[in-house]
Each structure stands twice: as structure tokens, then as C-alpha cells.
Amino acid sequence: ISLGTPAVRVNSDAGVLGISGSVANPIGLTIGGLGDHDVSGAISGTSFVTKDGAGSLLLRGNNSYSGLTTVSGGKLFVESSNALGSTATGTTVTSGASLQLRGGVSVAAEPLTVNGSMVAGDGALASTAGINTWTGPVTLGAAAVLSADADELRISGSISNPGFLLKSGKASALGNVKISGIISGAGMVEKIGDGVLTLSGNNSYTGFTKVTSGRLE
């Protein structure tokens, strides 16, 4: 599929819309609606990819697009370590949206900005199956939740928290979150839900640390 001008919007209002062919994206691609989308073909180009609407988007391809990835609604599932394209401009998750890693992926060097909390009980950054790793720097622009349904979410990149509440955990979920990156800033850290939160970095954040439920190591 070759996208022209202006930027293209793809909507699914019910069921699952599957795209298995490659997508050339020179201008911009927004995927939304109430339905779900499964994109297994590789997305290339220099422009952005945006997920909005209440449905879900699954990216499974070895993508190389270099624009910003924005999750502004629903859930974006990542099943490829390169699903989010080039690390040049990073990924942003807004309030009411969730970026979910599954299947044992390792997203390397991708900057992540989190400007919202959670959707349907899932964290703004979540692990849904397997041991999934985020190695890039994370910046909080608002209170945020990190969660794992099962197995582990590992974060080795630094976390900059200038004054917000960073929560980890999910009710009735046994997955664990391990943060080896350094948490800095004036913000707070709270362990919620079931499972274990492990902090192994030389952290310098100055806000409180609170264990509401589960275990903190």
C-alpha cells in the first residue's frame, strides 16, 4: 500500500481489519475507530503513525518509519522489537491509552513519553505475555501506571519523573515489573496491585515510596 497526500486515516468500526502488505507512509497514518486492526506488513517512510479511538492496533512488522508514534486512544500492541519504527522521534502515550508489549519483545533505545495513566485497568506501558523489555529513556508528563498481566515487564532505560506519581501493578494480575534504570526527579513511586516490583537502579528520586499492595524488592 502506498499512501499519498494528505495524511491517511484508516478506521474499523467492528471486527478486525487485517493489513498484511507493506505500507509506504511518506505523509502520515492514523488508525482508529471502535474496531481492531492487525498490521503485519512493514511500515516505512518518514512520517508519523497515530493510534486513536477505542479499538486496538496490533503491529507485528519489522517497521522502519521515522516519524513519531502516538497512542492517544485504545491499545497499541507491539509484537515485534522493531514495531515502533526508527528511534529518531520516539513514542508518546496520552491519557486513556495503553502501549502493550507481548510475546517476548525487546524495544531498544526508543524514547517514551507518558502523558496519562491507564485504560481498562492496564498501565500506560504494559506487558501482556512473555518477558518484555523497554531499554529506552522514559519521561513522565503526568501520573502513570506500569503493569504486567503475566511474566515480566523489564525497564532498563532511565525514568525521569519531575513531580508525578509513578505506580506499578494491576489488580488480579500476577506479572512482575523490574526496573533497573535510574528513576530521577521529584516524583513519587507507589506499588499497587498484585505481583512484585523490583527496583535495582541507583535511584535519586526525592518523592515518597509507598507499598499499597503486592511486594516491593
Model-found features: residue ranges?
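Glycine- and acidic-residue-biased ligand/ion/polar-headgroup-sensing regions
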Residues: 55, 71-76, 193-195, 211-216
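Extracellular, surface-exposed repeat architectures
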Residues: 1-61, 95-201
